[in-house]
Amino acid sequence: MSAPDALHLMRLRGRARAARCAALIVLAAAVPAAAGCGSSASTGSSTSAASTTASAATATTSKATTSKPATSIAGAEMGRLPKVPEPTRPTSLAASPTTGESAFLTAVFHDAEALWTREFEAAGLQYTPARLTIFHDQVHTACGTQSAAVGPFYCPADRGVYLDTRFFDQLGRTVGVRLGAFARAYVVAHEVAHHVQVLLGITGRVRAADHQDPAGTNARSVRLELQADCFAGVWKHATYERGQLTTADFEDALRAAAIVGDDFQQRRATGTITPEDWTHGSSAQRQHWLTTGFEQGAPGACDTFGA
């Protein structure tokens, strides 16, 4: 990376940190209920609609992970994945009126798949591609029949990423914030990250731990989701290195991460926050780990189980 590029990245990182607070403040002022995101839907459940304030999101950053899982859950394989290298071949992900929603989501999916394929090959591991399905209203999966209310999700049983194109506009409308292309891209990269977790054996180790220690299930679920956010940030690091990510783009992704935070959604639904019920993490947590992946550009920095 050249010196001017490195300086620009430092500026972008600093502005991204400031954007985390700005995104929370803007979203806290929104009144309508927000739809949830059904990530890693092994049972077809989705996060309930809700809201929060910026201060509440910050205050509850660490409460959901009071039961600290063993660091061995992350596994040695993740540490073998190298830092994302400088790109050798640019790929266009630009969204335009002629591109179409489905085409853009498909392009992001395949770009994320290509990144993880390279990462696995560099580590001497085999990457088995995920399956992409774009749906409307409802879809039949190995995890059961899911409605559009679930939002985008990953089904471990058939290793499929399922995306409802209307989810993104609906999510933005319900909180009064327009979500741009890279907010959508963040969600897609997050779901692909769940596939990466399955291939690395992380999801299997989490499920085994859940069986042995049911009381810690929610805490481990939060860490699994935050790791997927971090992996999504690693992908965003790669898009930045290709010159396809601007400050506004990353702020857009941070805004989306805030909306799908458990505290944000709980506050909107009930007016209260109960960290013990979280399954995905607070707005501040999700923004933190997305930023960590983006700044570090290395999967090894995403050990949320050892943090």
Residue ranges and their predicted role:
Residues W116, Y186-L199, D229, G233:
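Active-site recognition of the HExxH zinc-binding catalytic motif
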Residues V260-A307:
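Pan-zinc metallopeptidase signature
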Residues D169-Y186, N218-V222:
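Short pre-active-site segment immediately N-terminal to the catalytic Zn-binding motif
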Residues D137-D164:
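Catalytic zinc-binding patch centered on the HExxH motif and its immediate surroundings
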Residues G44-S72:
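Extracellular mucin-like PTS domains
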Residues T106-F109, E113, R118-E121, R223, ...:
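Short helix/loop segments within enzyme catalytic domains
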Residues C37-A41:
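Bacterial signal peptide processing site
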